[in-house]
Amino acid sequence: MIAFIQEIQRRTPLGWLQLSHHKSRLLVALSGIAFADVLMFMQLGFQNALYDSNTRLNRAVLADIVLISPQSRNMQNLATFSRRRLLQAADVPGVKSAESMYIGLVTWKNPQTRRKTSVQAIGLNPEQLALNIPEVNNQLDKIKLPDHFIFDRAARGEYDEVFSQIDAGESVTTEVDKRTITVSGTFKLGASFGADGTLISSDENFLRLFPRRQAGSINLGLVSVQPGYEPKQVAEALKSYLPNDDVKVLTRAEYIKMEEDYWKTESPIGFIFSLGVSMGFMVGVIIVYQVLSTDVNAHIKEYATFKAMGYGNSYLLGIIFEEALILAILGFIPGFIVPLGLYQLAANATNLPIYMTVARALIVLLLTLIMCILSGAIATRKLQSADPADMF
């Protein structure tokens, strides 16, 4: 190992010398790599925001096992099933409780701007804890009142005046699907790609927003398991006991994964973000290849001279790969810094969870290294054909 390090120290950094000799060409190359990195960072950031924002409610549900309709695709497209299945589920050994939850999209009028937008309405039993959101659990008495709701203060839109009124102890009235409601409290959950915010109230108030819905048709069944029982074991018992053509039994982890898988594989927007990452990678490969190919053509006589002096192809290839690694590392630095500001800008504009993570930075760095090494491998094909006899 020491001998290898000493050999590296004695070696002339020809790759760096050749790149730095043409500073304008180097700057163009680094700009291209940084652009490719920014494109990959932004697509991965949006993709993560897609998964994160659309699984927030799934992760906030207080349940060991979740019952849904087999026709349900995601949280924005939840079918209903009979509430009787909860009563049947309560008879299965290991089940501590089984509560219902109603979920649906409604059109609500922003009390401040008077503009209409889509928000997700949730109806739950105010006598039981259904969500792992302390702000909601502390205001269950408020939502027992007729037509009283609490609203998501992390919703997308202009609500500063509304939240100031509520924080001052005042109630705010507005319309939801042509019905007047009172907003008497707030909590924090966040917007998603499917809804600009969330309204929460009692199951009775929810059903008033949906007069055509039957109280016996629910969207979610929240099952809690007794101490000493494994959720997976109880879930298997529920699958055997309940008709699988009418209700689908999921553990908490499976319930979250179902939502994420929908946006990954079935949603067009998930495919678009993945395609964007691939396009960024290909743009980087093309840019780095053009730079390295131009460098090989410009110094083909020098490379032929090295061959005439007895240096093998491996030495010459090492120079090209040295250039590729230098370009990858130097190009990654601005490619990492710029998205930090863009993430903050996008998060403020959309209220979506867009932020940098260490894992994502390492992934893009690895992709950048692969991108540059791949470009170097393509560019070296011409180098191997450099023949001193043809040059001189």
Residue positions per predicted region:
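N-terminal Sec/SRP start-transfer signal
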Residues: 1-40, 51, 56, 321
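Hydrophobic alpha-helical transmembrane segments of multi-pass inner-membrane transport and secretion
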Residues: 23-50, 266-304, 326-332
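C-terminal membrane-exit region of the final transmembrane helix in multipass inner-membrane proteins
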Residues: 354, 359-392
